[in-house]
């Protein structure tokens, strides 16, 4: 079987050529022009960033992608679906204001922003998952499925539940409607280590479903698993590492469901994927803050295969030296630190991210075997 091709360029620039232009060259080297986009609606799936977070991809990159789509005759729009948790992206109105405030407007990116699952996150369509073991019908935002062509523009970084966020997470979790996100999180309920809990209640502010309870007697937090949706938002909210992912089986279930949702999105239509390994924060861009990067900026990757793309980004990251004064460096400096010889596992030991890659390959999203082609 022929290896999937992944194209790569670093962040070095020549005089007179900025990074947006270099991104356009990367896309064309990878063959995006081979997709028929003439008068086709093209969904560009990205994360607009939570208000207060500055780690998300700059709008200039989105504009570069939209420009190439328009050059090829396509009709692009930027899209994402609403969230489960508190913040500024849980309905389309707040989500649009958040996108605009973070710089994603028609004037700056050259195309409109459309929230994929509608006003309240309920405008979805059930899409059969071919070969799905965990999900038979994925609930995907209708606007995303209505598009003729699908492009993912991914900020590759760490993630407190998935281990890392790349193409598969941006597609699978990101394109799920609110009901779809709930289905993916259904089995992965977090746990609290009471010996580490300070009772600061910060995690309570992050829970949309009253799933965290403060015990007035012990002055510790508890999780009401009947109310908990399993979104993992509380994990990143805790500064004391008191909240962690549940058992490994539940975490594996989460990763497999996410892979199957991604398959539902890309199956049966032209798709193309771009990942930027830059500002590699330890947590998701869903947070209203972004911690210091755990790894150096590496570069931009592009491929028709989202799985090969994720694998290439992981491999590139694992070759890097952790940055000082970061969550990863702090974890490695702790007494009794157990080295997993893996930057993402050292940052989030219970994430089980490899399960997602393995399952994605099993169900036919793509291949983990790739050829890396570098362009200057």
Label for each model-derived stretch:
Residues 2-61, 68, 72-80, 85-376:
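Extended, low-polarity segments enriched in aliphatic/aromatic residues
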